[in-house]
């Protein structure tokens, strides 16, 4: 076992604080509308430029092991905030640094670290209560756009795109962010349900230009097993032909004779038909077929229910206003399923999402939920260079996470104002224990840190900004760092999601309080470099005769 280096008390805290400061100082330059970028070296390819706090934090590794431990604890703050809220990582880092700094000073002055921690926790609970009380629900698309604009660093186009996507696919819908090959950033919205299975034969194609099958007002047959012969389906196929409507068969597979017969009938023009493999595998395939049955108002033909293909009637088939099938995807728009049934199914999937412990299962369930509940939107981020696209994509992802958080828990005035105003709630708390009271005062001072940093990044003195805002009695009065004016933050659309602010403070105080109570640090001693190998060149003289090899 390697020897360990142990540091105690002030020495340990000083080294840890140096690490905290290095990481926090690198991250906090990105805060606010006038925050700067950070350039990060990559082991291969071009360097990456970003304004995303957690991306910067994840890149920092320090040589001194004790400093590095402090930095890694602070990195945990950014990562946790990113996991829970998806944004607010820089705010969380700034808050944590402020609490650790003040806490270290108090410990050095002889205060009890455990009492300080208790005071920090009491104050944070009061701030969170105040934030929840003050949060305003997000009602309109314009408010969603405002949140997106602020989180993407004042880019109104991104805010508008996210609002447009959320309006189309609903709050439950899936919105993904991808890189675009062109210069423009655009939104692609897929309404209805889309799954990644295409037609089983190109002979089903109705639109040769797009190489796609396009049916209006079609029947949908959902079958759990393979379809290998059509004999049992003949009565159903005849009924479909008489109805004059197209038919789409979605089954585990349609093979051999059955597929050939369908293709021949399609080419002769007697039957408008297409066949598609069912999406997913195993149990997930069955669940997705059941989703499709509920969406289209049909029944899943399943052996478990004792159903046979020969007994299927038109009433048992699903219906859809429009079906588009290309080589790789199938999209069903306007399924005939009852709204109440779809809502019940959505509720079941939500319950499964809460119960599951597997990230993979959760992701797949969320995909199913989105497909049933609204649709899918893809924001394709474009730019002149790869570096620009990556930087913009970071901002779009932050903005998207922020808007989702805003929809969940509402919004509060942005630009650090909500935390600054929460000082009033903390100021009302008093404790008989002076060390606990000192912990409360640490949070009281730390609540100013984000707004000070936003002001300083804009080149304005933070103390003046804080003083001016606190002089004004309006709860929504604040500093717009973009224009360097004092405005009504809500009226100007400068807002933060309450969830992001809450999560940032909770995570920052949790890790910072632990750092304040640290009295000893243990790290592995650096090993001395191994002695160099003895020079062996002297004995190789006889190799000189190889000169005639002609290399």
Curated annotation (Swiss-Prot):
Signal peptide: none annotated. Transmembrane segments: none annotated. CDD domains: GroEL. Its EC number is 5.6.1.7. SUPFAM superfamilies: GroEL apical domain-like, GroEL equatorial domain-like, GroEL-intermediate domain like. ATP binds at residues 30-33, 51, 87-91, 415, 496. InterPro entries: Chaperonin_Cpn60_CS, Cpn60/GroEL, Cpn60/GroEL/TCP-1, GroEL-like_apical_dom_sf, GROEL-like_equatorial_sf, TCP-1-like_intermed_sf. It is found in: Cytoplasm. It holds the Pfam family Cpn60_TCP1. Coiled coil: none annotated. It is an enzyme of class 5 (isomerase). GO terms for biological process: protein refolding. It comes from the Bacteria. One of its GO terms (cellular component) is cytoplasm. GO terms for molecular function: ATP binding; ATP-dependent protein folding chaperone; isomerase activity; unfolded protein binding. It catalyses: ATP + H2O + a folded polypeptide = ADP + phosphate + an unfolded polypeptide. NCBIfam families: GroEL (TIGR02348), PRK00013.1 (NF000592), PRK12849.1 (NF009487), PRK12850.1 (NF009488), PRK12851.1 (NF009489). Belongs to the chaperonin (HSP60) family. Forms a cylinder of 14 subunits composed of two heptameric rings stacked back-to-back. Interacts with the co-chaperonin GroES. Together with its co-chaperonin GroES, plays an essential role in assisting protein folding. The GroEL-GroES system forms a nano-cage that allows encapsulation of the non-native substrate proteins and provides a physical environment optimized to promote and accelerate protein folding. This is Chaperonin GroEL 2.
């Amino acid at each position: 076992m390697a020897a360990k280096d142990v540091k105690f008390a002030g020495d340990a805290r000083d080294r840890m604080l140096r690490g905290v400061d290095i990481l926090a100082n690198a991250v906090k330059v990105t805060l606010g509308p006038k925050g700067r970028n950070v350039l990060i070296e990559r082991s291969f390819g071009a360097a990456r430029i970003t304004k995303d706090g957690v991306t910067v934090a994840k890149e920092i590794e320090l040589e001194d092991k004790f400093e590095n431990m402090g930095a890694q604890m602070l990195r945990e703050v950014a990562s946790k905030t990113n996991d829970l809220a998806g944004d607010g990582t820089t705010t969380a880092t700034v808050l944590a640094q402020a609490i650790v700094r003040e806490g270290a000073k108090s410990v050095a002055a002889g205060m009890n670290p455990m009492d300080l921690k208790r005071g920090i926790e009491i104050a944070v609970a009061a701030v969170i209560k105040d934030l929840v009380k003050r949060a305003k629900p997000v009602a309109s698309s314009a408010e969603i756009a405002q949140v997106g604009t602020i989180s993407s660093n004042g880019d109104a186009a991104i805010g508008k795109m996210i609002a447009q996507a959320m309006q189309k696919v609903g709050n439950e819908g899936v919105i993904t962010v991808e890189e675009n090959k062109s210069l423009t950033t655009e939104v692609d919205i897929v309404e209805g349900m889309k799954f990644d299975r295409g037609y089983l034969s190109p002979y089903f194609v109705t639109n040769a230009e797009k190489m796609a099958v396009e049916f209006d007002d079609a029947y949908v047959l959902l079958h759990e097993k393979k379809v290998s012969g059509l004999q049992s389906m003949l009565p159903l196929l005849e009924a479909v032909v008489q109805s004059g409507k197209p038919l789409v068969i979605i089954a585990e597979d349609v093979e051999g004779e059955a597929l050939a017969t369908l293709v021949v009938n399609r080419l002769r023009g007697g039957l408008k038909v297409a066949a598609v493999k069912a999406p997913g595998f195993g149990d997930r395939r069955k669940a997705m077929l059941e989703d499709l049955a509920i969406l289209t108002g049909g029944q899943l033909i399943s052996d478990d229910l004792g159903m046979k293909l020969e007994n299927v009637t038109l009433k048992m088939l699903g219906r859809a206003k429009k079906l588009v099938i290309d080589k790789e995807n199938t999209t069903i728009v306007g399924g005939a399923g009852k709204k109440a049934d779809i809502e019940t199914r959505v509720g079941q999937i939500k319950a499964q999402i809460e119960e599951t412990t597997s990230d993979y299962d959760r992701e797949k369930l969320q995909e199913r939920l989105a497909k049933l509940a609204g649709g899918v939107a893809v924001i394709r981020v474009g730019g002149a260079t790869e570096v620009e696209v990556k930087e913009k994509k970071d901002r779009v992802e932050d903005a998207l996470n922020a808007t989702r958080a805003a929809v969940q828990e509402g919004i509060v005035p942005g630009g650090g104002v909500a935390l600054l105003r929460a000082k009033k709630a903390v100021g009302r708390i008093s404790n008989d224990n002076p060390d606990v009271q000192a912990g409360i005062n640490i949070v009281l001072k730390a609540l100013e840190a984000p707004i000070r940093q936003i002001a300083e990044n804009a080149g304005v003195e933070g103390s003046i900004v804080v003083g001016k805002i606190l002089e004004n009695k309006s709860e929504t009065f604040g500093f717009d760092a973009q224009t360097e004016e004092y405005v009504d933050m809500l009226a100007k659309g400068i807002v933060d999601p309450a969830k992001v602010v809450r999560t940032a403070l909770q995570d920052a105080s949790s890790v910072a309080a632990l750092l304040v109570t640290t009295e000893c640090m243990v790290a592995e001693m650096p090993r001395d470099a191994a002695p160099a190998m003895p020079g062996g060149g002297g004995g190789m003289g006889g190799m000189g005769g190889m000169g005639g090899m002609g290399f």
